[in-house]
Amino acid sequence: MAQVLIVGAGMTGSLCAALLRRQTSGPLYLAVWDKAEDSGGRMTTACSPHNPQCTADLGAQYITCTPHYAKKHQRFYDELLAYGVLRPLSSPIEGMVMKEGDCNFVAPQGISSIIKHYLKESGAEVYFRHRVTQINLRDDKWEVSKQTGSPEQFDLIVLTMPVPEILQLQGDITTLISECQRQQLEAVSYSSRYALGLFYEAGTKIDVPWAGQYITSNPCIRFVSIDNKKRNIESSEIGPSLVIHTTVPFGVTYLEHSIEDVQELVFQQLENILPGLPQPIATKCQKWRHSQVTNAAANCPGQMTLHHKPFLACGGDGFTQSNFDGCITSALCVLEALKNYI
């Protein structure tokens, strides 16, 4: 039975797992490892510590589907709409740039519900707090070491974490990446930003006419969303949640500052945008060191195969673009590359 490891429980990794399960007729052991405490990657949904039903999307806010991808990836959209994982965005987002024919979708149960859907479909064994440190070749298998626990062996590996994290891995993988591939990987770049989630008590009123707003006149804040309103799930029994995304220049400037300092600065600027906001009962500040790809890997559409037997490839938005369709494209390319090795 083939033993497959997918590193990264984000959009690309979870879809790779689901597609692999659907397209493999024989027995298959499928493991998904992630360094975080939950699935989602940059499509993460945080919960209030006081009420798990009070949630906030700290990564991707909504999904924009262009006419090109509406046709090309129709089966993926149809499936998620049929399961109720996605729903058309019906709430007003001020300052959103709309192009003709584009459709926007939200995830009523939180954006991470997309990832949870695919992981469930995959039947994979999903492990959190598993940070991969080394990948070595041992008797035609991959031996994978993590920060804690014993090394484990696999026949095939797909790496879907941000490219700089792939380049940090130790072991034989460092010599298996060719000089040309290394240059391509080192040229991949990302923007950085912070996201802040604010959770409120039930009954709290945040009286604004919009569900989300792009801010153009603030050095710190780029986007604000009343998250439950954006997802059209307002309830008198569950408090509202607010999501703030910082600008990229702010994210870069304060990248190595403490979360507490950053949170305080964002709060100060938020007072200028939404004066007199009530006090939240909980907050969650998320640093996105690798937020969105600004330069994807050149000349390797969708994935990069680092080794054939045993198979090792990397995929993710670093090889396409930082959106839902970019991740689908990468997952399909990974599957195409490994189908002869499974």
Swiss-Prot record:
GO terms for MF: epinephrine binding; monoamine oxidase activity; NADH binding; oxidoreductase activity, acting on NAD(P)H
GO biological processes: negative regulation of blood pressure; negative regulation of heart rate; response to catecholamine; response to epinephrine; response to ischemia; response to salt
Tissue specificity of this protein: Secreted into the blood by the kidney. Highly expressed in the kidney, expressed at lower level in heart, skeletal muscle and small intestine. Its plasma concentration is markedly reduced in patients with end-stage renal disease, as compared with healthy subjects.
Cofactor(s) demanded: FAD
Leader sequence residues: 1-17
A cellular component annotation (GO) from this entry: extracellular space
Task performed by this protein: Catalyzes the oxidation of the less abundant 1,2-dihydro-beta-NAD(P) and 1,6-dihydro-beta-NAD(P) to form beta-NAD(P)(+). The enzyme hormone is secreted by the kidney, and circulates in blood and modulates cardiac function and systemic blood pressure. Lowers blood pressure in vivo by decreasing cardiac contractility and heart rate and preventing a compensatory increase in peripheral vascular tone, suggesting a causal link to the increased plasma catecholamine and heightened cardiovascular risk.
PANTHER family assigned to the protein according to its UniProt record, in alphabetical order: RENALASE
Family the UniProt entry places it in: Belongs to the renalase family.
Protein name: Renalase
Taxonomy of the source species: Eukaryota, Metazoa, Chordata, Craniata, Vertebrata
